[in-house]
Every structure is written in C-alpha cells, then in structure tokens.
Design a protein with these regions (language model features):
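Short catalytic-loop micro-motif centered on adjacent basic/acidic residues
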Residues: 42-45, 70-73, 135
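Short, flexible, glycine/charge-rich loop motifs used to bind or transfer phosphoryl groups or to couple energy/partner
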Residues: 23-24, 32, 60-62, 86-87, ...
Length: 155
C-alpha cells in the first residue's frame, strides 16, 4: 500500500537475468503497476506477460470486488504493457487512457477494440473523485509515446 487508496500491484521478477536482452540484472527487476481506488478506479500500467498471472491476482485482491474504470497506459514497451490484453478481456468495460501516439502503437501489439479509448494531451486531467490525474507528455524519454501522470491529491 502506497497510501490508503493507492496500492502497488506490480510484480518482482527474479527469474530474468537481462533487462531488454542486454543489461545484466543479477537481482532481477520490478514491473511497477499501481491502482488508485476512488469513486472511479484507475490502473496505472500493467506488467510484462511473464508475470501476468501474479499481476492479475494482485489486481483482483486490490480491487476487492470492484471493477476498474480506467487503464492508464503511460508506455507501450512490453515490460509495462504486455498484459493490457488480459486486463481488457477480464474487464471489457474498461476505458483505455493514452495519448495520440499510444493507440496506433497499441494496434501493433494487440487486436483490441479502442472505441472506449480516451486520448489525452499535455495538461489534460482525469478526475477519479478525490484524486485528479494531470497528464504530462514525455516523448523520447524512452519511447515516443511516453507520458507521466501527476496525482494532485497525494502528490
């Protein structure tokens, strides 16, 4: 638990020995994902498919019977995004949140209906209840579609 209503649902991967196939990680890596529990629920990224089952279990535990409203996609690289399909299959009413570069990339990885997608741009906000996310574009920090989210409630 990060705060009363922000929960870590990521997974540690101690089985991997190379990050991105080239960087040695003798202790493995962490796939970070969070869920914000508010009037509306937002999942912040997913995890690598290698740890998808554990991630979905963590998500289900955190949700405690509730259904998520949004999946915020801040980065399309597989270690952040390869469990998107599984989340959408489990929660078909979920709205995918990304920027203008996210959704064309999403279609390259998954066969998903993006009619429930919400495209955000620099400075847009998403009100969840007490929590309000502000989106900041960070292109080429790593990949061209990268964005970050700022929660004005818990900073």
């Amino acid at each position: 638990m990060i705060t009363e209503d922000i929960r870590y649902i990521g997974v540690n991967d101690h089985d991997i020995d190379l990050f991105e196939g080239q960087y040695q990680v003798p202790n493995g890596i962490s796939y970070n994902s969070y869920v914000i529990m508010d009037e509306k629920i937002a999942i912040m990224d997913t995890v690598d498919k290698r740890k998808q089952t554990e991630f979905l279990g963590n998500l289900e535990t955190a949700l405690a019977g509730r259904t998520p409203d949004y999946l915020v996609i801040s980065h399309m690289e597989p270690d952040h995004a390869s469990s998107i399909q599984a989340v959408v299959e489990r929660y078909p009413e979920i709205t995918l949140v990304g920027n203008a570069k996210t959704f064309p990339m999403l279609k390259l990885y998954f066969d998903l209906d993006t009619s429930r997608a919400l495209t955000v741009k620099e400075g847009d906000t998403l009100k969840l209840g007490r929590h309000e996310l502000t989106f900041v574009m960070a292109p080429m920090v790593h990949w061209p579609e990268v964005m970050v989210s700022y929660d004005s409630c818990d900073k």
